[in-house]
Amino acid sequence: MRIFAMLLALFALPALARDAIKVVYHFDAGLEQATKGLRNIKNHLDVDPKAKIVVVAHAQGVNFLLDGAQNQSGNPYNIPVEELAAKGVEFRVCEITLKSNKIDPKKLIPEARLVPSGVVEVARLQAREQYVYIKP
């Protein structure tokens, strides 16, 4: 039995090493955090293009996903979001935040997908789907 366990571990480790790393980026602090976080994600994918990345936005973190949102230099956020989405990055927005701030979901850019709660989504991804957590 012990030899079987050792053989299983020996052959399972290379398979695990090939699996894509799953990462949840947590945005909740406004446009400056979004600028930094989007740059982090681009760099992340440059180094590890197989990474599975989900951005969860709530509170002030949803603002960069609103149609027409711009960074501090006046550059639109939708362009880097579109580029990252084309690489498989998912953008999830807290429905509670939208309701409490009276933001019409139609104001979100097309890449954004609603989830019932941003905080619950972050917890679910970590606990149930083994995502690692990054907060830029």
Stretch-by-stretch model annotation:
Residues 12-14:
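N-terminal signal peptide c-region/cleavage motif recognized by signal peptidases
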